[in-house]
């Protein structure tokens, strides 16, 4: 994707490039970055699985730590991205820079708070997340280095989202890919060559996150972006805070509910044995590879919608939504079909002698593959609402997948089908999300058409 120094050139690119060319140009770097990141998470699990089922379960438990850190950054990151893209579209560049700087330093503070609390209450937190006596020692080793990286991880979310928001998706991709490739290279070195075991996997991840953060900061230091990060631009405003929290709350609660859902699944699954716990987490890691593709496409579409909405180009909002919906749902359906067919060979990569892990994992993975088209639809509708500043629909969809549609059916499915209910609950929840996503999509689409028919009536761009 071309890079621009002149703000007017970038606006022209965002507002006049044909949608079938613009959305893929914006989405492909995001998809690549998200897929590579998911791949190294998967590789991390694959390498650790060579240490045994207990170690694999420990990595699954610590996945909730990652989500807690993500919560710290996503509230600010998603809200800042939505607001800055609309501000840039409306040519309010200086205010957009102040929004980014404010959110960056607040995310740094939140990440530091997670680090301090995590080390202070480490054992209690890990037990709460679902660790048992068998996997607690591994969980403690893995948790240590991840917590040290928390401030960099939290601020990386802000950097990533705001780079995409201004159309600089390539910079975002480079940072994510470089960190992922480094992690895959360091994992076998630290785990096996140095003999550090689970702690080696954690150290590799922490170092990779730090390197990724440095790369994401580079375009801001070299002034290759429309936005800048300066402490003198740290200017909290109540009006901006309300807007950022309103838009970021969807991601915040989604990650919060994802953390809670993961904790509940871990605590219930461990009652059926360590193999069941490991199977659920391995299947979820593989599924994350597919959901990341959906999310990456949505993150490419969101700034297109935001820029167009801020510039009152409602025809482009409508066209980009339609194009993105068709492309995302069709693409993820094809990928899910392939993964579902080869589910068993994929699970066998993670264990050679644990038949129970493979049996439960294959079932869970195939159920989630069936639900992928529904998930893709929900992601695009959510990104549309986020991009154009529709906080309430965005929040509802953010709460749906691992909240509104998840928690009510979890106890019922566990009661009826035991471990098989646990294995299929996420797929069932994804299907139920459609009950919210379809009416929201219809209502928002009607409003876009109305504004388009009125030739962009008087509205606030932010």
Where on the chain are the PLM-derived regions?
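Helix-terminus/linker motif at the lipid-water interface of multi-pass membrane proteins
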Residues: 35, 39-57, 126-133, 189-196, ...
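Interfacial/gating helices of multi-pass transporter permease domains
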Residues: 48-67, 134-138, 198-201, 240-247, ...
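Short alpha-helical transmembrane segments in multi-pass integral membrane proteins
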Residues: 1-27, 84-151, 193-249, 305-371, ...
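Hydrophobic transmembrane alpha-helices of multi-pass small-molecule transporters
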Residues: 68-71, 183-188, 213-217, 289-292, ...
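Short runs within selected transmembrane alpha-helices of multi-pass transporters and secretion channels
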Residues: 77, 146-164, 172-180, 201-214, ...
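Small-residue-rich hydrophobic transmembrane alpha-helices
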Residues: 56-116, 153-172, 266, 279-343, ...
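Transmembrane helical elements of multi-pass membrane transporters/channels
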Residues: 25-44, 145, 179, 208-212, ...
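Hydrophobic residues within alpha-helical transmembrane segments
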Residues: 28, 32, 62-68, 105-109, ...
């Amino acid at each position: 994707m071309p890079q621009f120094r002149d703000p007017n050139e970038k606006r022209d690119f965002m507002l006049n490039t044909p949608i079938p060319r613009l959305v893929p140009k914006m989405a492909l770097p995001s998809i690549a970055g998200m897929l590579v990141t998911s791949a190294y998470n998967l590789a991390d699990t694959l390498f650790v699985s060579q240490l045994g089922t207990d170690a694999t379960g420990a990595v699954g438990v610590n996945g909730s730590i990652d989500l807690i850190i993500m919560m710290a950054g996503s509230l600010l990151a998603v809200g800042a991205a939505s607001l800055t893209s609309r501000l840039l579209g409306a040519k309010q560049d200086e205010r957009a820079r102040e929004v980014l700087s404010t959110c960056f330093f607040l995310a740094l503070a939140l990440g530091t708070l997670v680090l301090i609390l995590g080390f202070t209450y480490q054992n209690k937190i890990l037990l709460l997340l679902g660790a048992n006596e068998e996997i607690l020692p591994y969980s403690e080793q893995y948790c240590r280095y991840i917590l040290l990286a928390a401030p960099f991880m939290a601020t990386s979310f802000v950097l990533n989202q705001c780079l995409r928001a201004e159309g600089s998706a390539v910079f975002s991709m480079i940072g994510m890919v470089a960190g992922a490739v480094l992690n895959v290279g360091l994992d076998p070195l630290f785990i096996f060559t140095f003999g550090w075991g689970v702690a080696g996997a954690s150290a590799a991840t922490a170092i990779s996150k730090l390197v990724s953060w440095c790369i994401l900061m580079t375009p801001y230091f070299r002034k290759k972006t429309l936005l800048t990060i300066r402490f003198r631009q740290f200017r909290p405003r109540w009006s901006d805070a309300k807007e950022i929290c309103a838009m970021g709350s969807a991601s915040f609660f989604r990650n919060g509910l994802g953390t809670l859902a993961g904790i509940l699944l871990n605590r219930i699954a461990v009652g059926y044995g360590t193999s069941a716990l490991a199977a659920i987490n391995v299947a979820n890691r593989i599924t994350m590879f597919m959901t990341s593709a959906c999310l990456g496409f949505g993150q490419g579409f969101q700034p297109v919608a935001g820029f167009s909405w801020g510039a009152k180009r409602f025809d482009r909002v409508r066209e980009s939504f339609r194009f993105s919906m068709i492309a995302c749902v069709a693409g993820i359906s094809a990928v899910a079909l392939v993964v579902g067919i080869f589910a068993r060979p994929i699970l066998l990569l993670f264990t050679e002698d644990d038949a129970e892990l493979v049996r439960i994992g294959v079932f869970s993975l195939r159920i989630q593959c069936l639900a992928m088209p529904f998930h893709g639809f929900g992601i695009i509708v959510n990104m549309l609402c986020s991009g154009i500043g529709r906080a309430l629909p965005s929040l509802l969809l953010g709460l749906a997948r691992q909240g509104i549609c998840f928690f009510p059916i979890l106890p019922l499915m566990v009661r009826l089908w035991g471990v098989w209910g646990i294995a299929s609950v996420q797929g069932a929840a994804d299907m139920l999300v459609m009950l919210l996503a379809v009416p929201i999509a219809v209502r928002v689409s009607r409003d876009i058409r109305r504004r388009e028919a009125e030739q962009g009536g008087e509205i606030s761009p932010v």
